[in-house]
Amino acid sequence: MVVIRLARGGSKKRPFYNLVATDSRNRRDGRFVERVGFYNPVGSEGSENLRIALDRVKYWVDNGAQLSPAVERLVKEHSAKVSAAA
């Protein structure tokens, strides 16, 4: 089953996450099918902390992918921000 989840990167005490579509049996930071965004929880105030390709997330969900709880929260937050800006 394909799942969209966070893959951790960055260094110690400075996390950086990629939102990836991957097989659920793969390791958290292992092989993935497609990178659909990123999340930087400790980014500076002026930088972009969250970017999600909502069209690609919709594509994967329409084809049976499931979102992890953290990714589901981030997608809701990002889509609300995008709709408010438009």
Curated annotation (Swiss-Prot):
GO function terms (MF aspect): structural constituent of ribosome
NCBIfam families reported for this sequence: S16 (TIGR00002)
GO CC term, one of those recorded: cytoplasm
PANTHER family the record matches: 30S RIBOSOMAL PROTEIN S16 (PTHR12919), SMALL RIBOSOMAL SUBUNIT PROTEIN BS16M (PTHR12919:SF20)
Pfam families per the UniProt record, alphabetical: Ribosomal_S16
Name of the protein described by the UniProt record: Small ribosomal subunit protein bS16
Gene for this chain: rpsP
GO biological process: translation
Lineage: Bacteria, Pseudomonadati, Pseudomonadota, Betaproteobacteria, Burkholderiales
InterPro entries: Ribosomal_bS16, Ribosomal_bS16_dom_sf
Family indicated by similarity: Belongs to the bacterial ribosomal protein bS16 family.
SUPFAM superfamilies: Ribosomal protein S16
Organism expressing this protein natively: Bordetella avium (strain 197N)
Keyword line: Ribonucleoprotein, Ribosomal protein
